């Protein structure tokens, strides 16, 4: 463990830490020594000043995303739950691998991987995909389990997951249930067993209802959207966020049969 800094903000005492974890967990177990390429896992430990030296139970926050960094706090009220949580817990706020102050994955990372396979686009793309697979939920929770075992003496902790953190919660409970006292989620519980088709079959009728409500409120937009859809097959307009616009982007339910 490397202690990077200790400081206070109004109402909170914060420590910044970093540890090494394997880039690839295959062949390694959390809590044990490892070799090969490593990456950095950054995390913060947060308490109130009056509890700095108290033996509080641990709560780890499983951030949303995917690829989300932990909350950046200026006070106990910076994030809605921190004020109450720090009354009872020592709160751990990790940045997931690939995000925040942990070893990042960004466009520069992907460009370096592609450059290593210059001249063979397909091989470069496969190498990029293989690298990104090392940043999935199973690796994220193995990082956290390694953190629990090596830096917190193997003490069991409470988990709280937000959005994608709900998916991390179930992954944690599947792989390392013995390390968890209790789990809370504020959203993002995946379907069990996983079936994306069934999830979207429940989603589409709601989208249809919401679209109808929108057009009731803004009826003039119905003609505008219809006019845009007519032009899309031959249009060259490009959206900053999604690339070339198509009717499937504007209307992702086009061609979908939904039971009302």
Feature annotation, model-predicted:
Residues 235-260:
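Alpha/beta-hydrolase fold active-site neighborhood
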């Amino acid at each position: 463990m490397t202690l990077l800094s200790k400081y206070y903000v109004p109402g909170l005492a914060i420590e910044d830490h970093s540890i090494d974890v394997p880039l690839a967990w295959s062949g390694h177990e959390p809590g044990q020594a490892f070799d090969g390429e490593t990456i950095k896992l950054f995390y913060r430990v947060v308490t109130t000043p009056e509890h700095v030296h108290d033996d509080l139970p641990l709560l780890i926050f499983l951030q949303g995303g995917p690829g989300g960094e932990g909350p950046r706090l200026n006070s106990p009220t910076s994030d809605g739950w921190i004020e109450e949580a720090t009354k009872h817990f020592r709160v751990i706020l990790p940045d997931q691998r690939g995000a925040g102050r942990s070893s990042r994955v960004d466009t520069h990372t992907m460009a370096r991987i592609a450059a290593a396979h210059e001249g063979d686009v397909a091989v470069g793309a496969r190498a990029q995909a293989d690298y990104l697979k090392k940043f999935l939920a199973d690796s994220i929770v193995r990082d956290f389990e390694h953190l629990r075992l090596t830096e917190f003496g193997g003490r069991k902790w409470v988990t709280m997951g937000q959005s994608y953190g709900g998916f991390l919660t179930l992954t944690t409970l599947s792989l390392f249930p013995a390390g968890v006292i209790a789990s809370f989620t504020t959203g993002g519980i995946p379907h069990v067993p996983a079936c994306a088709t069934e999830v979207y079959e429940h989603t589409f009728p709601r989208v249809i209802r919401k679209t109808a409500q929108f057009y009731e409120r803004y009826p003039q937009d119905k003609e505008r959207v219809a006019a845009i859809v007519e032009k899309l097959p031959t249009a060259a307009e490009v959206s900053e966020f999604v690339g070339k616009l198509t009717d499937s982007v504007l209307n992702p339910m086009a061609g979908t049969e939904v039971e009302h």
